[in-house]
């Protein structure tokens, strides 16, 4: 028996398009119009509350929490060091974004605080950052102080939180 050889140029027959099939045979969940008529959130309205809009400044990440203890602060700084971020300390007398000199969004639009010394390149211990923070607080006790974690590879600020609020700022 001789082997059969198929030619690559031979065409295969394809059936012509016959149109879409009817969807009447597919299962469909039908709801009665009566089942949606009694839907109400009326029972939940009494327990809803509105967030207070005045006298409730929120500054940065973790600002909704009570002030951080020394241990909590060291844990946060340790977290940013473990991620390879560079700690920076900043301070400001106001503590939140505002526009004083300009209404156009540019470099000096109120988002930048004064940096305390230089970023702490090469820092690998949270207590070093804490000592610098205490020195900054001693020099500027009436200012807000925050810790920033800067990623020098991505060139972005990855974390920022208030580490100290001056007395009477709440």
Swiss-Prot record:
- Record keyword Chloroplast present: yes
One Pfam family, please name it.
RbcS
Gene Ontology cellular-component annotations: chloroplast
Q: Which GO terms describe its molecular function?
A: ribulose-bisphosphate carboxylase activity
- Transit peptide as recorded in UniProt: 1-46, 1-47
From the UniProt annotation, give the residues forming the signal peptide. Answer: none
Q: List where in the cell it is found.
A: Plastid, Chloroplast
Which UniProt keyword terms apply here? Calvin cycle, Carbon dioxide fixation, Chloroplast, Photorespiration, Photosynthesis, Plastid, Transit peptide
What is the predominant subcellular site recorded for this chain? plastid
Quote additional remarks.
The basic functional RuBisCO is composed of a large chain homodimer in a 'head-to-tail' conformation. In form I RuBisCO this homodimer is arranged in a barrel-like tetramer with the small subunits forming a tetrameric 'cap' on each end of the 'barrel'.
Q: What does this protein do?
A: RuBisCO catalyzes two reactions: the carboxylation of D-ribulose 1,5-bisphosphate, the primary event in carbon dioxide fixation, as well as the oxidative fragmentation of the pentose substrate. Both reactions occur simultaneously and in competition at the same active site. Although the small subunit is not catalytic it is essential for maximal activity.
To which protein family does this belong? Belongs to the RuBisCO small chain family.
* Subunit: Heterohexadecamer of 8 large and 8 small subunits.
What is the protein name given in its UniProt record?
A: Ribulose bisphosphate carboxylase small subunit, chloroplastic
